[in-house]
Amino acid sequence: MTSPALNFITFNQDHSCLAVGTSKGFRIYHTDPFSRIFSSDDGNIAIIEMLFSTSLVALILSPRHLIIQNTKRASTICELTFPSAVLAVRLNRKRLAVVLEEEIYLYDISNMSLLHTIATSPNPSAICALSPSSENCFIAYPLPKPREDPDANRPAHAPPQSTFVAPTSGEVLIFDTLSLKAVNVIEAHRSPLCCICLNNEGTLLATASETGTIIRVFSVPKGKKLYQFRRGTYPSTIYSMSFNLSSTLLCVSSTSDTIHIFRLGAPPGNTTPAGAPIESPASQRQDRWSRARSYDDSESPGASAADSPKNEPAELNGPGAGNNQGGHTRGSGSFSSMLRRSSQIMGRGVAGVMGSYLPQSVTEMWEPLRDFAYIKIPKSAAASGASRTLRDAPGGPLRSVVAMSSSSPQVMVVTSDGGFYVYNIDMEHGGEGYLVKQFSVNHSVLEGDDKSDASGYGS
């Protein structure tokens, strides 16, 4: 029997559940222990969103039609029809946000009354984040751009009388869904936005541009830049970002097969002028697992393309070097690799000292910010049909979704072929996480190191 195509995969707000929309209904799973708790075989589900661990789910079966359903009572609470296709749905205990390509509809979730309609620039990727918090109830989305701008870089092939619409901006608008007022605009990137997310308390915003080499974290609603991380050397499309519930870690997945985990937080006063924590000797020891980082800050709002070199070569132990396909090694033991790591530690130490004397736009070039830990996800050996379905889904491109467990230092990864993977992270030393459990959301249990949760699967 052929498994239904996967259309949509998402974690709920506290990462305790996983919802999967398929061509033949939808399923909901507990993440720890991993077990199926609800399933429905009705409809071709393009989008599904949960409200924490309640029985309320939002479903998109046809492009313009939203259904709010109570799974416990098997009843429909309400149905809404929109003027164009629904690209995303966001929920918290106060608000429901429905994202269309050029509008966002805000509803009071207690009575489903329409509160406000936000006009946006064309946003086909549905870049939008709603805080899970009922107090800091902010929604973030790309700052709308004027539809007609005489200074816009109109393509040469555009018809003379046409209206050129600029691509999504690199600025984020923060909107308070309780007061229904815009509260701030954050200049996050010079390149168009690709992915944004808010933490559980609605106090932190993570952003990534289409370039995908730099991840930034800002305070909300003030918009102060707190952290700047480097994901890698080469451009990559960011698919998913997620804070853990305590907002001390940020997970990022992309087109590469590496999940990056960045550490947030530093002792008071132990920061660089740009707000990035200075590394301790313990974190410097992680160099043996680090890869080269791009020093291209051209997407930074405060930097120009001439500020830094763009062709920084990768380290010899980086991806694609020799026979090391994983890209992360625990040191080759050679004299040259030892010398290189020593030079990196010394160079980064000098960068931290020099940063205190240089302007912010210059110190950002020196910041030795990198992932605290990382994960190598398995490459799918299955046919790419499921992947194509997920990429073509109204929710936008989706190859992998990540979240941190709420009860342990573990990272959960769901891939577009239906694999569900759980990795342990060493919270003291970081480095490479190791696989401890693996299951499938396609009705079969994958081989793995831990079969303890398999009995609950499919029940």
UniProtKB/Swiss-Prot annotation:
Keyword Repeat attached: yes
Gene3D superfamilies: YVTN repeat-like/Quinoprotein amine dehydrogenase
Annotated stretches, region: Necessary for proper localization to vacuole membrane: 229-232
Region of interest (Disordered), ranges: 264-339
Protein's cellular compartments: Preautophagosomal structure membrane; Vacuole membrane; Endosome membrane
An individual GO BP term: autophagy
Keyword field: Autophagy, Endosome, Membrane, Protein transport, Repeat, Transport, Vacuole, WD repeat
Function: Component of the PI(3,5)P2 regulatory complex that regulates both the synthesis and turnover of phosphatidylinositol 3,5-bisphosphate (PtdIns(3,5)P2). Plays an important role in osmotically-induced vacuole fragmentation. Required for cytoplasm to vacuole transport (Cvt) vesicle formation, pexophagy and starvation-induced autophagy. Involved in correct ATG9 trafficking to the pre-autophagosomal structure. With ATG2, protects ATG8 from ATG4-mediated cleavage. Autophagy is required for proper vegetative growth, asexual/sexual reproduction, and full virulence.
Family affiliation: Belongs to the WD repeat PROPPIN family.
Official protein name in the record: Autophagy-related protein 18
Organism ancestry: Eukaryota, Fungi, Dikarya, Ascomycota, Pezizomycotina
